[in-house]
Amino acid sequence: NYEESMELNKLYRVRGMLDGREPLISRRPFREVHHTATRAALIGGGIVPRPGEISLAHSGILFLDELPEFKRSVLEVLRQPLEQRSIQITRTSGNYIFPADFMLVSAMNTCPCGKFPSTACTCTPAQIQAYLSKISQPFLDRIDLSVEASKVEYRDLVKESVSCPESSAVIKVRVCEARKRQKIRYQNTKIQCNAMLHGAELSKYCRLNGEEMRLMGQAYEVLNLTARSYHRILKVARTIADIDYSEEIKLEHLQEAIGYRTLDRKYWGRYV
């Protein structure tokens, strides 16, 4: 919207990145950061701090490829902005706060050679542990959706066309409708989307019935969830319900949301 566009343009102006070809940014940004990026490059820095990549991705997407290749200390600085949607940089001249409300998207292999858990993997357990331990549990808690991409079979690779249950265009319509539902639901509040729900708001808008409550209780114990990951599952389930045109969070919505957290247990639970 207009307010988001103006805020983003101010950030790019402070960074000196506006030019005559695109004097006004009207599209959501997509920022891809290389794994050699420093802490200052990511969150901002300088004697007089300037916005970093997380602020340049404000209202858009920040993409981190080869996630475990980043220094752990660099990844850890993302924990605050992922919660607060802003970053604070302190200097002797004062405190500087930059907006950083971005969607984090990342990709990674499960080991240095990229073939674990296949028998073709050449890594030792110690190498796998060292690789995965670059990503801490508190950082993982802030990841809402974890999806494992399976190996593409040769017969699928050489197919001239691959059929999909739904096209991107069809999915886009459902997502836009879900955002409209959220806009109506939160029209008299400061909340813009489900991801912004906290505290009492979760109890109000993510209410569960008996069967759903029992499932969440089981998941909390079996998956050893933290309070943060528990609340994030509720928000994801609320979004899945919206995409499914449902006012209530049903059992199948919760099951899908919980399924997006199982990679933590599958890989990090084994080696970290």
Language-model regions: role of each:
Residues 4-7, 41, 53, 66, ...:
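Residue-level recognition of specific faces of alpha-helices
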Residues 48-49, 72-271:
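Basic, amphipathic alpha-helical bundle interface domains used for macromolecular binding and assembly
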Residues 28, 32, 67-68, 133, ...:
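Hydrophobic alpha-helical scaffolding
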Residues 59, 65-67, 77:
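Walker B catalytic acidic pair
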Residues 23-29, 34-62, 95:
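Conserved alpha-helical scaffold flanking the Walker A/P-loop in AAA+ ATPase domains
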Residues 1-6, 10-18, 84-86:
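Post-Walker A helix-loop "phosphate-sensing" segment adjacent to the P-loop in P-loop NTPases
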Residues 5-6, 22, 97, 189:
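Interdomain boundary/hinge elements
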